[in-house]
């Protein structure tokens, strides 16, 4: 659907070259929700602006449906942009227009007949749950309602792609969840390809099928959501994951390790999370199991669990228990310097 092929964007600033995007190669499949996460200045927003040619790449090509969009004429670009909807952190609504007027605006620009505009806008108002707000102005709406208007406006011309630029960053947690659920509904019912950028890993966790991590203009990690969360390879990705899965060792656990305690990290995935493995080893081996920390989250309908346990007993019995655990779950001894 969308392909970035060795894409770079360089700006000249004060006689120096600034690489906002550097040699990025990515593919976004049709109908998926693809997240791009990174800290401020990572190049996320620049990469998004390249998709609808608000910025042109310095090098490389960008393709949509196997067509190189970097070589399109001005007329062809206008047509392309009708296929791409966009929502923003700051909503970007017209304060002088009603909710109906805001949603109708792109349809008027496209010279859609009035009766069709009315039908389409009413359909979208129902879809986003704002049927009773058609005649309200933006200042009369909450932040979540404004973003719903933004989503409806972005969908007005029936685009194939929806770009989300930090769409939930200005919202409270409860409203963020509501907007993410609405975006999942958009993806599911319209089969829309969604490309979103964020600095919030919990947003990626809730909505994305795949994710790319950017740092200093480069993609440093990319893959399926479950793989990136459960096996992060880079330090930056690990830090993002820890904002959702807190696996830092508490001071009390570190103290136990430093005092000679045998601490192990057990990782469970899928059906493994429901197995009574700790109960089994406690009953069948002469060891005591002390659970120090644990959590379970759901990633794309697959459970992922993380436990820190201390095993106490004779060394021979502990080794037998560990041998059994290795057959059931991923197991790693925690070192004193771990954090």
Swiss-Prot record:
Gene Ontology cellular-component terms listed: plasma membrane
Homology family: Belongs to the ABC transporter superfamily. Methionine importer (TC 3.A.1.24) family.
Compartments (UniProt record): Cell membrane
Entry keyword set: Amino-acid transport, ATP-binding, Cell membrane, Membrane, Nucleotide-binding, Translocase, Transport
Subunit structure of this chain's protein: The complex is composed of two ATP-binding proteins (MetN), two transmembrane proteins (MetI) and a solute-binding protein (MetQ).
Primary localization: membrane
SMART domains: AAA (SM00382), NIL (SM00930)
Topology in membrane: Peripheral membrane protein
GO-annotated molecular function: ABC-type D-methionine transporter activity; ATP binding; ATP hydrolysis activity
Cited InterPro entries: AAA+_ATPase (IPR003593), ABC_transporter-like_ATP-bd (IPR003439), ABC_transporter-like_CS (IPR017871), ACT-like_dom_sf (IPR045865), MetN_ABC (IPR041701), MetN_ABC_transporter-like (IPR050086), NIL_domain (IPR018449), P-loop_NTPase (IPR027417)
Residues of the ABC transporter domain: 2-241
Keyword Transferase: no
Name of the protein in question: Methionine import ATP-binding protein MetN 1
Enzyme class: translocase
Protein residues bound to ATP: 38-45
Organism: Bacillus thuringiensis subsp. konkukian (strain 97-27)
EC assignment: 7.4.2.11
Listed PANTHER family: AMINO ACID IMPORT ATP-BINDING PROTEIN, METHIONINE IMPORT ATP-BINDING PROTEIN METN
Catalytic activities: L-methionine(out) + ATP + H2O = L-methionine(in) + ADP + phosphate + H(+); D-methionine(out) + ATP + H2O = D-methionine(in) + ADP + phosphate + H(+)
Classification via Gene3D superfamilies: 3.30.70.260, P-loop containing nucleotide triphosphate hydrolases (3.40.50.300)
Function: Part of the ABC transporter complex MetNIQ involved in methionine import. Responsible for energy coupling to the transport system.
């Amino acid at each position: 659907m969308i392909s970035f092929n060795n894409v770079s964007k360089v700006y000249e600033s004060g006689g120096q070259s600034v690489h906002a995007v550097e040699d990025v190669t990515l593919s976004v499949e049709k109908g998926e929700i693809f997240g791009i996460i990174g800290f401020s200045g990572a190049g996320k927003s620049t990469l998004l602006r390249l998709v609808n040619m608000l910025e042109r790449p310095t090098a490389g090509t960008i393709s949509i449906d196997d067509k190189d969009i970097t070589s399109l004429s001005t007329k062809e670009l206008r047509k392309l942009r009708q296929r791409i909807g966009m929502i923003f952190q700051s909503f970007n609504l017209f304060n002088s227009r009603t909710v109906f007027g805001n949603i109708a605006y792109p349809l008027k620009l496209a010279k859609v007949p009035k009766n069709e505009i009315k039908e389409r806008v009413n359909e979208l108002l129902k879809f986003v749950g704002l049927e009773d707000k058609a005649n309200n102005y933006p200042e009369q709406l909450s932040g979540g309602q404004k973003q719903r208007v933004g989503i409806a406006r972005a969908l007005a011309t029936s685009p194939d792609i929806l770009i989300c630029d930090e769409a939930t960053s200005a919202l409270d947690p409860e409203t963020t969840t509501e907007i993410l659920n609405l975006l999942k509904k958009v993806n599911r019912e319209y089969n829309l390809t969604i490309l979103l950028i964020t600095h919030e890993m919990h947003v990626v966790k809730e909505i994305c099928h795949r994710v790319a991590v950017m740092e200093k203009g480069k993609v440093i990690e990319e893959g399926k959501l479950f793989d990136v969360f459960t096996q992060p390879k880079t330090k930056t990705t690990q830090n993002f994951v820890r904002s959702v899965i807190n696996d830092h060792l508490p001071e009390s656990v570190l103290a136990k390790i430093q005092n000679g305690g045998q601490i192990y990290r057990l990782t469970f995935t899928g059906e493994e999370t429901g197995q009574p493995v700790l109960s089994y080893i406690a009953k069948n081996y002469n060891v005591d199991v002390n659970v120090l920390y644990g959590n379970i989250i759901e990633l794309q309908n697959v459970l992922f669990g993380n436990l820190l346990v201390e095993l106490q007993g004779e060394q021979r019995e502990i080794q037998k228990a560990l041998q059994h655990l290795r057959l059931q779950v991923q197991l790693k001894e925690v070192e004193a310097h771990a954090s």
